């Protein structure tokens, strides 16, 4: 299974395509999601919370720049823009999958940068 593609699809689907419901089949029912500025969330909490983020972030988009996979872990480095009204940010997501390719743990870290995203 190509976990790099799964990780990239997960991120671009929930951000650029804005399709929260269509990621559910990628998620383990007991998954945990942690983002540097938010409390930990379960799968159900993420699926309920994410549409609110999208509603408050009409210009939110992600540009994946590099993806590295090792075993069941995938690291994705991206540039994001427009999340909750913020500017351009470096974004690193560390994603861990189970043996069936379901996302079981996600940790996202972001920091603001001065540069603009490539158009």
UniProtKB/Swiss-Prot annotation:
<comment type="function">
    <text>Probable cyclase; part of the gene cluster that mediates the biosynthesis of ochratoxin A (OTA), a mycotoxin composed of a chlorinated type I polyketide dihydroisocoumarin moiety linked to L-phenylalanine, and demonstrated to have nephrotoxic, immunotoxic, genotoxic, neurotoxic, and teratogenic properties. OtaY is probably involved in the polyketide cyclization.</text>
</comment>
<dbReference type="InterPro" id="IPR032710">
    <property type="entry name" value="NTF2-like_dom_sf"/>
</dbReference>
<comment type="similarity">
    <text>Belongs to the aurE cyclase family.</text>
</comment>
<dbReference type="GO" id="GO:0016853">
    <property type="term" value="F:isomerase activity"/>
</dbReference>
<protein>
    <recommendedName>
        <fullName>Probable cyclase otaY</fullName>
        <ecNumber>5.-.-.-</ecNumber>
    </recommendedName>
</protein>
<keyword id="KW-0413">Isomerase</keyword>
<dbReference type="Pfam" id="PF12680">
    <property type="entry name" value="SnoaL_2"/>
</dbReference>
<dbReference type="InterPro" id="IPR037401">
    <property type="entry name" value="SnoaL-like"/>
</dbReference>
<comment type="pathway">
    <text>Mycotoxin biosynthesis.</text>
</comment>
<dbReference type="GO" id="GO:1900818">
    <property type="term" value="P:ochratoxin A biosynthetic process"/>
</dbReference>
């Amino acid at each position: 299974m190509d976990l790099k593609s799964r990780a990239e699809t997960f991120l671009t689907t929930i951000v650029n395509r804005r399709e929260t419901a269509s990621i559910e089949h990628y998620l383990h029912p007991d998954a945990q999601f942690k983002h540097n500025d938010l409390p930990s969330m379960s799968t159900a909490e993420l699926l309920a919370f994410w549409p609110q983020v999208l509603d408050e972030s009409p210009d939110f988009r992600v540009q994946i720049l590099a993806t590295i996979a090792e075993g069941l872990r995938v690291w994705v480095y991206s540039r994001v823009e427009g999340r909750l009204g913020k500017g351009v940010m470096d974004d690193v997501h560390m994603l861990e999958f189970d043996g069936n390719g379901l996302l079981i743990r996600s940790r996202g870290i972001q920091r603001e940068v001065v540069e603009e995203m490539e158009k």
